[in-house]
Amino acid sequence: MTRLQGRGSGPRPKWGTYCLRSVDDGRTWKSHAVIAQDDANQPLNGYCEPSVEVMPDGSLLAALRTEGGMEADQKTGVLYLAQSCDGGLTWSTPRAVNPFGVFPQLLRLDNNIVVLAFGRPGVNLLFNVDGRGERWQGLTLLVNEGQRFTHTSGYTSLVATGADRFLIAYDQFDYPDADGEPRKTILVREVVVR
């Protein structure tokens, strides 16, 4: 199974998020389910940039961003979570987990702690220890407070490196090189979660 995003139709189409499923090792894919789409109550441009992770109980958790609006103060929308307890056939109504965020990334470690990384502003981490994705704690900002609005795209990548640790990669627009000149740089940090 994989996830994707797409736009609806009509005069003001909004983003939606969907699951595709393959039963032939990825040679062909078919529509499996809608995670979230074109909610009439969603004030921005819909749900996009989905990330899906298998939770310790076997359920699926999806993290979704909402597309930012066109107003100057709407640079990013709310970050949402949705859950499936039937292999991704049906999904709960998305619920807000953070008032902002782009490109959410979920990662379950072998110690069953689930990491949620997201950005804009900044690069942020949240941690779930209940195994169900209900309670999140430990909001951590990985860039300097004064740089969180202008010095990173906020897009990240996560990879587990052990039962209680992972690498996070993210960009910084003006990281000083060996001569002190600001350069766009990809940074990687190891994080240990116990």
PLM feature spans:
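Asp-box/BNR beta-propeller blade signature and adjacent active/binding-site loops
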Residues: 1-194
